[in-house]
């Protein structure tokens, strides 16, 4: 049995904002003798180079084909995944904050006009390309990676592991260019980065997955979605939940146990039955 908690997204370092919570996925993995599983525990998002919040990484159980250097290969190796929460934007008016990771879809970041879309089972969350700013990187979510927020000066700082291992500025917050938005959370498909009208769109949450890979099938699978910075009730009521994990970051509050502004890391628990 696998109990997979996604990591939370980061809050913005200057204003009263919140990152999104991580998703939660459970299921029984049918394994074969001598098989190898790779366990990925996602890291929380934190403030990026422009203080806006970056997206959380993803947590999951993968086949041995996961190597951390090819998004397409790693994506095909997914057995069960929980998505990360989206990062917050530089705006105290969009109080709901980054979208939570979830299943089947991640949650859209707030507000509806400029929040990044949640990842789905078949594609990354959309980028609301609007407003006065411009997106200078890849702002639409994709396989295992969240989109970059609208603005400039993106960077891998604050991005939750393992979203940044594939290169680029995926899941990064951004700022300037008339736009200050949060990064999308990573996941089976990542959430979109926030847009700019109204200024300060929050990132969308990444999607979970319970579909197995090859001979590693999943039975009794279920996935759950958080609501902005709060993880799903099924996650927090699990006997394997640890205080602070999966929570979205909150400005100036150590909500995730990793310091102020940062979300809570992910967690993976496996129970083996002979």
Annotate each predicted stretch with a short phrase:
Residues 74-76, 258-267:
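Extracellular interaction modules
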Residues 59, 262-274:
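Short, structured beta-strand segments at or near domain termini in extracellular proteins/domains
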Residues 13-145:
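Secretome/extracellular-domain signature
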Residues 77-80, 108-187, 191-206, 212-224:
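Acidic, glycine-rich loop-and-strand cores that form catalytic or ligand-binding grooves
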Residues 6, 41-45, 274:
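Surface-exposed loop/turn motifs at beta-strand-loop junctions within extracellular Ig-like
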Residues 193, 199-261:
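Contiguous ligand/interfacial binding patches
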Residues 1-10:
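Beta-rich globular "head" domains
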């Amino acid at each position: 049995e696998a109990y997979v908690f996604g990591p939370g997204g980061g809050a913005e370092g200057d204003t009263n904002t919140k990152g999104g919570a991580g998703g939660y996925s459970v299921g029984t993995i049918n394994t074969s003798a001598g098989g190898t599983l790779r366990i990925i525990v996602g890291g929380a998002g934190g403030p990026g180079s422009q203080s806006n919040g970056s997206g959380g990484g993803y947590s999951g159980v993968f086949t041995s084909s996961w190597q951390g250097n090819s998004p397409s290969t790693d994506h095909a190796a997914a057995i069960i995944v929980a998505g990360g929460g989206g990062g917050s934007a530089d705006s105290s008016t969009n109080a709901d904050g980054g979208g939570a990771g979830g299943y089947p879809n991640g949650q859209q970041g707030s507000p509806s006009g400029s929040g990044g879309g949640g990842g789905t089972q078949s594609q990354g969350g959309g980028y609301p390309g609007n407003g006065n700013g411009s997106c200078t990187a890849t702002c639409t979510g994709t396989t295992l990676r969240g989109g970059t927020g609208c603005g400039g000066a993106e960077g891998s700082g604050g991005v939750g592991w393992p979203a940044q291992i594939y290169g680029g500025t995926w899941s990064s917050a951004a700022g300037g260019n008339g736009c200050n938005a949060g990064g999308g959370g990573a996941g089976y498909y990542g959430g979109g980065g926030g847009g700019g009208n109204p200024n300060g769109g929050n990132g969308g949450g990444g999607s979970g997955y319970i579909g197995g890979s090859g001979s590693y099938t999943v039975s009794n699978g279920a996935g759950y979605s958080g609501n902005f910075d709060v993880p799903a009730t099924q996650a927090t009521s699990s006997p394997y939940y640890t205080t602070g994990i999966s929570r979205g970051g909150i400005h100036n509050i150590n909500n995730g146990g990793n310091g102020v502004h940062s979300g809570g890391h992910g967690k993976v628990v496996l129970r083996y039955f002979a």
